[in-house]
């Protein structure tokens, strides 16, 4: 399979033939000078085909015979729609949107977009997609999209985990504006630390990512792009409340200080104080929780000099309380009076991104990314403590330029990472330091028509992982109009933090067994894998309505993996290095179709074949459905008045096939579970009433079919006994949840 894939990658350029395109430059007027606009959106009206301008303000998009309305938009500027009847090179100058009475031709932007011209398979979820659901935090932002699977990690803490290509989030590089964010100590709960209202968009990259972003990515990358003080509303507030007792407040305050500086304060708070036990197992269905999350952003932009910069300062305090209904922490903490758990996290993040574009050579630029974080968690689960402090320093210097012409571009740079871990595990202390220095080079060739490739290589020296190379390759080919074929191959390597990544097993009676393999991290060797992938997308027009269909296939082949074995013994969770094969295969097919004006349908089917060599033999991955189906339908009415009022309706249906449940055959009969779960369906829906462009209210329901997993907690009647386990989760553990909220902004 690997040889065939590599042969395909080598032969692909031989099949290239030309395709007409529309290209150009987007500029703005700054003191009489035409300055390139970076990040402007360029797309064909009514389609999901779009691109974003680069640092030089340039773009290139396939010419569309079916739709000749090209839309150019950028926040703070009047949207422009051009009538393009033939391939050409154009220059668009944006104008400040200063007149609300101006008559402008508008077009609806797709909620989810995939570019035909990007080398990587990147799915972009913009604000329209994120507003289809409550999206209280990053972990809840993928419910309407099939690229990411979301489920509860256990039945005690109420934490959601995500999977991509059949692999859990430690194998996914999760970044915030391309700076690593959810890693190390934050793997278990870090997805809940980014409020949904802070998100401008999310980019999901399947398979091998860019060497510019490091060597740890194996399954793909999720990048969260935050709102910018310069373009966000001057004031924004979001109130949210649900019948499960969760209340939430989000407030944004932004101020443009002068022509170059802007700042914003983003304040988030959530609280749940109600104890509910709807399934009568004696445990709280959703943990009591409170969070205070404050972000201060500073944005600097000097178009005359070419300098831009962002400074971010964030403080987080998050507390959770879970366990039996009668648990009182002041009396029962770390005793057998009642089973309970408290997780208290404090976190500080400081980061900076600075970039410079050379005035006379717009194709040349450099950027510097730096960040520091201090993550401190104090936790206990029943009688077992788990504390971790993780301090991290990250820096990445990137230089962009060309080789002779703009068809041949490159990125080169240096990166540095430092991590210090201090853990207290049940009754032992463990500490380690990791540091790495790396250099990377990434070459991009684009013929300006229908073919491009990105070939990258990085070399790193790591005090634990040693010296190693990370190669990655991406190819893009447009065989005919409205289509794109992509292929990728790449290597990833990481050291596994087995305790913090698997904290859910503390909420059980399983003993932790770590097999010493002579490695330098918990006695285990680092994880290493190759990822191979290919995808094809074709847009179409049926009955006068546009749509697209796509198919992708990815293989992740582990050369070494830390096997987390919960099948060998139901009273243990064992960790050991892979002896044999571990392969994850993923196939996904998607159809997006515009049924009528403002009425969109999305259908997705996904198949997984994930297997690993365990001590018992080769087994399929536990608690992972081989088959999944998603259907999403979204409708919005025409504007009801000149203020932008309208109704929005959205519904998402998920069908999840049967899943293998880890063996409990040696347990007493009353504590045994079936070998496989039953398939189930889940339905989410939301209605939004937009009164004006500044004010809207919404009402929604999660799991409205009220499906609940049977026996989410094994031996809940004996939590200090040998068979207690809250980690056998394959479906929803809470019933239907109704929520409502409002959004208000002042520009």
Where are each of the predicted segments found?
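Short, acidic, small-residue-rich periplasmic hinge/interaction motif at the N-terminus
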Residues: 27-33, 38-45, 71-77, 87-131, ...
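Membrane-embedded beta-barrel scaffold of Gram-negative outer-membrane proteins
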Residues: 365-379, 478, 486, 522-577, ...
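Gram-negative outer-membrane beta-barrel transporters
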Residues: 449, 550-558, 575-662
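Short acidic/polar hinge/loop motifs at secondary-structure boundaries
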Residues: 59-62, 179-206, 294
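Flexible loop and strand-edge segments within Gram-negative outer membrane beta-barrel domains
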Residues: 272-293, 299-364, 372-390
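C-terminal beta-signal and adjacent terminal beta-strands/loops
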Residues: 493, 655-664, 688-747
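N-terminal periplasmic accessory domains that precede
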Residues: 87-93, 138-141, 160-163, 175, ...
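Extracytoplasmic beta-strand/coil segments of soluble accessory domains associated
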Residues: 139-180
